[in-house]
């Protein structure tokens, strides 16, 4: 979207550079990168970034409104409701399409929004390797609102681990080794020090949960849930 950067990237692109880039991504956790990775980043100008952020803020204003839960309560099937939920999601992901309006200007159009975590740990490593591969100018970053890899990682840790010992926090999934996003599970452990545990491996004792932490039965005090109900229901059927 930034013509000068696009032209420079295209002129400098070689298959050898791309293969070397992919090799570095693969080397993060060999055999775990199970989805397509684009040959090029998208070079987003400041004005378009501002439009996307503005759209996100407008939507979030609705979500954090105290009336939102009552307005959407009937939209969630009773069998997937979780007791003691927070007032709003800690993680929200927006997918935008790049469209042209009647004036010929580019503007973002919301395709999808999900209140669920995605590749949050992997993207920290991905952004770093992509910036190196694309030879991005120093003032360009995948992080928004002044965040850096360090401050982003710290925020992620505050949300997921909080003030707990990382060994008492787990990433929960169903058959994690089979998931296409499993590289993010391994990157999460690398960044935050928390283990990935399969739902079938949890140990329930009274109202407490435990998991086998390298031979030591360890209490689970917080769960970073990556389990999608649809996947669980497929397993049950």
Mark where each language-model region is:
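Preference for protein termini
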Residues: 1-237
């Amino acid at each position: 979207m930034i013509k000068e950067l696009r032209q420079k990237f295209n002129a400098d692109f070689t298959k050898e550079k791309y293969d070397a880039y992919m090799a570095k991504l693969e080397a993060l956790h060999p055999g775990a990168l199970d989805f397509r990775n684009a040959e090029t980043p998208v070079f987003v100008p400041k004005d378009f970034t501002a439009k996307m952020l503005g759209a996100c803020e407008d939507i979030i204003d609705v979500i954090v409104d105290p009336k939102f839960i009552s307005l959407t309560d009937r939209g969630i099937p009773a069998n997937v409701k979780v007791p003691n939920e927070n007032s709003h999601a800690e993680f929200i992901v927006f997918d935008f399409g790049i469209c042209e309006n009647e004036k010929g200007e580019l503007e973002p159009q919301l395709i999808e929004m999900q209140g669920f975590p995605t590749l949050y740990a992997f993207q920290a490593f991905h952004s770093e390797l992509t910036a190196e591969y694309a030879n991005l100018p120093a003032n360009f970053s995948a992080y928004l609102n002044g965040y850096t890899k360090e401050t982003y990682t710290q925020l992620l840790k505050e949300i997921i681990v909080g003030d707990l010992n990382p060994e008492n926090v787990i990433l929960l999934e169903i058959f994690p080794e089979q998931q296409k996003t499993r590289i993010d599970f391994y990157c999460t452990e690398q960044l935050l020090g928390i283990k990935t545990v399969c739902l079938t491996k949890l140990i329930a004792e009274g109202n407490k949960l435990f998991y086998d932490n390298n031979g030591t039965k360890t209490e689970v005090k917080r769960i970073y849930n990556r389990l999608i109900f649809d996947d669980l229901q497929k397993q049950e059927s």
